[in-house]
UniProtKB/Swiss-Prot annotation:
Native source species: Neisseria gonorrhoeae
Modified residues (O-(2-cholinephosphoryl)serine): 75
Self-association state and partner proteins as the record states: The pili are polar flexible filaments of about 5.4 nanometers diameter and 2.5 micrometers average length; they consist of only a single polypeptide chain arranged in a helical configuration of five subunits per turn in the assembled pilus.
Family annotation (InterPro entries): N_methyl_site, Pilin, Pilin-like, T4P/T2SS_Core
Taxonomy of the source species: Bacteria, Pseudomonadati, Pseudomonadota, Betaproteobacteria, Neisseriales
Protein name: Type IV major pilin protein PilE1
Amino acid sequence: MNTLQKGFTLIELMIVIAIVGILAAVALPAYQDYTARAQVSEAILLAEGQKSAVTEYYLNHGKWPENNTSAGVASPPSDIKGKYVKEVEVKNGVVTATMLSSGVNNEIKGKKLSLWARRENGSVKWFCGQPVTRTDDDTVADAKDGKEIDTKHLPSTCRDNFDAK
């Protein structure tokens, strides 16, 4: 006697569930990295908005601005903020963006990135990367304090070392 089979067998369903689980295991980390990179891009965008004011101050005064007020940008630094960015601070000509400690990807909570410039052949050349501090008009030093954004979350245009030239 022939019976008509309808639906899927238990083995077929288990195989499909296993495949979906494997795909999710691969896709989830990629999605997490994508969201972190998107959130970091907001920090870069806000920090880059301060470059022209810092450059103008340097070209007019021959030294880097000490803080947000002298650079002519919003002060206190917490006035420059975004959905994922806590503040953007100008300190001795280094523009540092700090991510929020909640509401952002876990891997970038409270982390920082910096934009800094050097005088080069009569113009000002900007760099972007991990947090730095300016030691004098021409030198910056690595400011590693455990608050660096993992390089994989930085765009390729923002991976300069503190000693970049």
